[in-house]
């Protein structure tokens, strides 16, 4: 069997983005109940990088509706392989740049740098470790590693919309993951 064929088979075998971890069907952020909108696995080539879940007040099927929905939101992650904090921060930066207009990215440069500093401050995410992002209107976005908040809330609604576009934008980190996040609970 030729190498391209083997690679294609490996990629196809991971074609569904079902998660390794079962995420809770509901959570609460700032006293507001949120529902699991969808969950999936981020692949980098054929390797599983992390499982991810998106929680919203009401289920949606489109990226535009998820981004536009008001109220608190939450993104939860479970690392599936060792990833350096710097690599994770840089991947977020690339995702922000690829999915947001430059003027908006420049406007939120301070928050973006703080986000990168949070992940770069951790030498590596180990398999099984968790991280999350919670957005609360009029407060901002709080980042959590292993359930512990990493500093004060950052940014505003527009900043969290930028963050959501990493996975829901026109050039998402992983198309299968985007589809899974918008597919509804398993």
Enumerate the language-model features and the residues they cover.
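Mid-length scaffold segments of soluble, non-membrane domains
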Residues: 60, 64-138
């Amino acid at each position: 069997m030729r190498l391209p064929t083997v690679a294609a088979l490996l990629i196809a075998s991971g074609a569904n983005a079902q998660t390794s971890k079962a995420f809770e069907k509901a959570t609460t952020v700032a006293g507001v109940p949120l529902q699991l909108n969808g969950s999936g696995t981020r692949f980098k080539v054929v390797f599983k990088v992390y499982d991810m879940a998106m929680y919203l007040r009401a289920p949606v099927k489109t990226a535009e509706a998820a981004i536009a929905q008001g109220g608190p939101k939450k993104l939860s992650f479970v690392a599936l392989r060792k990833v350096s904090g710097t690599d994770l921060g840089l991947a977020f930066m690339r995702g922000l740049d690829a999915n947001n207009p430059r003027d908006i990215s420049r406007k939120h440069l301070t928050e973006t740098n703080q986000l990168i500093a949070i992940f770069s401050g951790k030498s590596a995410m180990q398999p099984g470790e968790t991280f999350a992002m919670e957005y609360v209107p009029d407060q901002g976005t709080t980042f959590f590693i292993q359930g512990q908040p990493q500093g004060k809330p950052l940014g505003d609604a527009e900043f969290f919309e930028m963050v959501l576009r990493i996975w829901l934008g026109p050039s998402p980190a992983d198309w299968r993951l985007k589809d899974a996040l918008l597919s509804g609970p398993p």
